[in-house]
Regions:
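Conserved N-terminal beta1-alpha1 strand-loop-helix module at the mouth
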Residues: 1-92, 112, 171-172, 196-219
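Catalytic beta/alpha-barrel core
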Residues: 22-24, 44-55, 72-81, 94-103, ...
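Catalytic cores of alpha/beta
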Residues: 34, 82-92, 125-134, 169-185
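Glycine-enriched alpha-helix->loop->beta-strand junction motifs that scaffold or abut catalytic
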Residues: 39-44, 70-72, 90-97, 111-118, ...
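Glycine-rich beta-strand-to-loop/alpha-helix junction loops that act as flexible
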Residues: 77-78, 164-169, 185-189
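Glycine-rich phosphate-binding active-site loops on the catalytic face of alpha/beta enzymes
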Residues: 96-106, 139-148, 181-203
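Short, charged, surface-exposed secondary-structure boundary motifs
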Residues: 106-110, 127-132, 148-151, 175-176, ...
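Shared catalytic-loop signature of beta/alpha-barrel
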Residues: 129, 145-165, 169-171
């Protein structure tokens, strides 16, 4: 008897691999290439970014399709600002909801649905709010707007238990962030740096390099 692949826990994947790929646009060729590359390299979580009108339908439809075609991949939705959108994502089968802000109602919605939540924060106060609201890992956003390594060193010196995830980082930025104590990284367009987003092999090469630099391992 063949056992169906079990969808992993996205935050567990992030803790092991130290990577959470996030992609846009959501055309099928791009989504499938990323999904195939993620599975090949053991990065078994993928975030689909909401970007303007029509993106919710595209993201939620992609989740449904990937659940059927790539059941071993935990797929989630990013750029979620409110509980209504979070509920729609959960109903569509998302396994993680990622936000640029910390909205406790969104966290409660995810908890009720048994879905992982990765909220965003930009200050120590916002990080504390996210943690008090149930987050075990917190996205640093917008990480590109500050000296992220310096921020991490300062924050973790006072709150070493925080698990902070800078996002939209390039391969060259990862070593300094690792040294500063980042718990993981959101990667996507800047990781590709001009490589074909429809090529699973090109994406896989960058994921392999990022895993090596980040100190993560296949899940």
């Amino acid at each position: 008897m063949t056992t169906a692949p079990r969808t992993p826990n996205p935050l567990a994947v992030l803790a092991q691999t130290r990577l959470l790929p996030a992609i846009s646009p959501l055309e099928s060729a791009v989504v499938n290439a990323w999904a195939d590359a993620c599975i090949e390299h053991g990065v078994l979580a993928l975030e689909l970014l909401l970007r303007g009108d029509g993106s919710e339908r595209a993201a939620f439809g992609a989740i449904t399709r990937l659940a059927s075609s790539h059941p071993q991949l935990a797929v989630g939705v990013g750029t979620v600002f409110d509980a209504r959108t979070a509920q729609r994502a959960c109903d569509a089968g998302a396994r993680i909801v990622v936000s640029p802000i910390t909205d406790p109602a969104t966290g409660s919605t995810c908890a009720a649905a048994g879905v992982d939540w990765l909220p965003g924060a930009f200050t120590p106060t916002e990080i504390a709010l996210a943690e008090r609201s149930g987050a075990t890992q917190v996205k640093l956003f917008p990480a590109l707007a500050i000296n992220a390594p310096a921020f991490l060193r300062s924050h973790l010196a006072t709150k070493p238990s925080s698990r902070i995830i800078p996002t939209n980082v390039s391969l060259d930025e990862i070593p300094a962030l690792v040294a500063a104590g980042a718990a993981g990284f959101g990667v996507g367009e800047r990781l590709l740096a001009g490589a074909d987003p429809r090529s699973a092999s090109a994406i896989g090469e960058r994921l392999h390099a990022a895993l090596s630099v980040a100190g993560g391992g296949a899940y």
